[in-house]
């Protein structure tokens, strides 16, 4: 009745302890859409999750208002929360959507 996502924590004796950058081979990028960035950051911090800096907000271009910040899962996986409070810029020119956060 909806999407499902599994994230695993693996261990091994020869495990590297440095997580890959998003731009590295084998890197990853997983983002979660949030309606309220401040509330989402507070939720993560209240749970003891390390938020990597302050949220970044675009103030011009077609991405005006887009806000994002990375955080670290307890097992070292870098994840992101993102918000588009004014929608995405391309949406003004077409009825097509890349994705819809309601689903």
Describe each model-derived feature in a short phrase:
Residues 9:
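Pocket-edge structural micro-motifs
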Residues 1:
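Short, structured active-site "lid" loops
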Residues 5, 32, 38-103:
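Vicinal oxygen chelate
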Residues 27-28:
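Eukaryotic phosphotyrosine signaling hubs
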Residues 13-14:
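Amide-forming acyltransferase catalytic core, primarily the GNAT-like/NAT-type
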Residues 20-22:
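Short consensus segments that form the blades of beta-propeller domains
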């Amino acid at each position: 009745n909806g999407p499902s996502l599994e994230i695993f924590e693996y261990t091994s004796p020869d495990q590297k302890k440095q997580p890959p950058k998003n731009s590295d081979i084998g890197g990853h990028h997983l983002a979660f859409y949030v309606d309220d960035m401040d509330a989402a950051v507070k939720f993560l911090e209240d749970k003891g999750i390390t938020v990597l800096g302050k949220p970044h907000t675009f103030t011009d271009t077609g991405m005006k208002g887009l806000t994002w910040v990375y955080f670290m899962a307890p097992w070292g996986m870098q994840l992101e929360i993102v918000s588009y409070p004014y929608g995405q810029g391309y949406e003004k020119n077409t009825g097509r959507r890349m994705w819809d956060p309601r689903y």
